[in-house]
Regions:
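Functional cores of ribonucleases/endoribonucleases
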Residues: 186-217, 226
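C-terminal structured interaction module
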Residues: 224-252
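Boundary at the C-terminal end of the N-terminal hydrophobic targeting segment
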Residues: 22-24
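Long, positively charged binding patches that form subdomain-scale interaction surfaces
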Residues: 124-201
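Bacterial N-terminal signal peptides
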Residues: 10-20
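Contiguous hydrophobic, core-forming segments of folded domains
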Residues: 83-146
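N-terminal low-complexity or amphipathic/hydrophobic leaders
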Residues: 39-103
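Bacterial N-terminal signal peptides that target proteins for export
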Residues: 2-12
Length: 252
């Protein structure tokens, strides 16, 4: 299926919104998603899939994504949408502009969290296994998507903001696999290395249902970092989590 563009036919907005609701049918925690990682990588089509103004913005809604044209990142914190434009050299966030669109976006709404202390320092592989183990213990199925968070300190942290510039390997496949360290210095993204940073990771776990759709193909985790004051944010490429951090899993 080709991507829908909202730039020229305002009437298509209702169709896109209807499609988004249809995609969310049967998914837990009011998960909605727009765009498709794998399809975008194959086609190179980075056109807008939904107006940011049309996204759910109720309190308790958390999400991640990228702007149309791959020229910025999106994070949603407790209902508040924030954009990190690729034009900002420091990765700072701002409110969405009136006509801004997302090429990729996924969010879920959580009314109650279960806090789980991280017992030791963990690299990304160990932490993601920990998330899955704790989610299963809470009664969540690993086949279905859910939103989660982790608050604390990150001894190793590399994140980026896409700039929309064309470069070798550009495209949201350039949203590098965060566990394997594919990110490097390129014209199509701004890289930020912040070892020891404090703040939170906002994540979407794809489950089998949405793997390759809301996450990088072959992965089930899509993570964005936001500092403690939510002044900077971007897509996480590599990270570790310090002992004492708090994993927040959705209950309802």
């Amino acid at each position: 299926m080709k991507y829908l563009s909202l730039r020229f036919v305002p009437g298509l907005l209702a169709c896109v919104l209807f499609a988004g609701v249809a995609w969310a049918t049967g998914l837990p925690f009011s998960i909605v998603h727009y765009g498709n990682f794998q399809r975008m990588m194959h086609t190179g089509d980075a056109s807008g899939q939904v107006m940011l103004a049309a996204l759910p913005q109720q309190p308790g809604t958390w999400g991640v994504g990228a702007t149309a044209g791959l020229n910025g990142e999106i994070v949603q914190i407790d209902g508040r949408l924030l954009v990190s434009p690729g034009s900002d050299a420091n990765g700072r966030v701002r409110p969405p502009q009136a006509d801004e669109q997302a090429v990729l976006f996924a969010s879920g709404r959580v009314q109650e969290w279960r806090d789980v202390a991280v017992p030791r320092d963990m690299d990304s592989t160990a932490f993601e296994a920990f998330v899955q183990t704790q989610a299963k213990a809470l009664g969540l199925t690993l086949e279905q998507p859910f939103v989660f968070r982790v608050e604390g300190r990150f001894p190793h942290l590399l994140w980026h903001v896409l700039t929309g510039q064309k470069g070798a390997g550009s495209g949201h496949g350039a949203h590098a696999s965060h566990g394997t360290g594919h990110a490097n210095s390129r014209s199509d993204m701004r890289l930020f290395r912040q070892p020891g940073a404090s703040g939170q990771l906002i994540g979407i776990y794809s489950g089998a249902v949405l793997e390759g759709v809301v996450s990088h193909p072959g992965e089930r985790f899509h993570l964005h970092f936001a500092d403690s004051d939510a002044t900077v944010s971007g897509h996480v490429d590599r990270y570790s989590v310090a002992a004492g951090a708090v994993l927040k899993l959705p209950v309802r």
